[in-house]
Design a protein with these regions (language model features):
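Signature of N-terminal electron-transfer/Fe-S-associated modules in redox systems
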Residues: 1-116
Length: 116
């Protein structure tokens, strides 16, 4: 039903929960998943910051949160903590309590802006 956000992907650059989307609806569209975030062996700054900040535990929610955070930073390179929390509200995590996730996203945003 798309309630937890773990299935988040970008469809033509728009963040969507993929589990309620039929394959026919995605035909001919650009689909971006967490697997496309890295460049070869070079991790995306969001992926690196998640590791640095220990922002994952079981990992179930991580792909969806990373894709959602990437979508946020594509629209807003300098989000406030409140904006990050609001943007990721559709992604549920039962392990981390979100603070480490928020710090990781804020750190990646700073790095991508060249402010880190």
């Amino acid at each position: 039903t798309g309630d937890c956000g773990a299935c988040s992907v970008l469809v033509d650059g728009v963040l969507v929960c993929s589990c309620p989307v039929l394959g026919a609806e995605a035909q001919g569209k650009k689909i971006e998943t967490v697997e496309g975030m890295s460049s070869g062996s070079e991790l995306h700054p969001l992926q690196r910051k998640f590791i640095e900040h220990a922002a994952l535990q079981c990992g179930f929610c991580t792909p969806g949160i990373l894709v959602a955070a990437k979508a946020l930073l594509a629209q807003n390179a300098n989000p406030t903590e409140t904006e990050v929390r609001y943007w990721l509200a559709g992604n549920l995590c039962r392990c981390t309590g979100y603070d480490k996730i928020i710090r990781a996203v804020m750190g990646a945003a700073a790095e991508l802006r060249g402010a880190a």
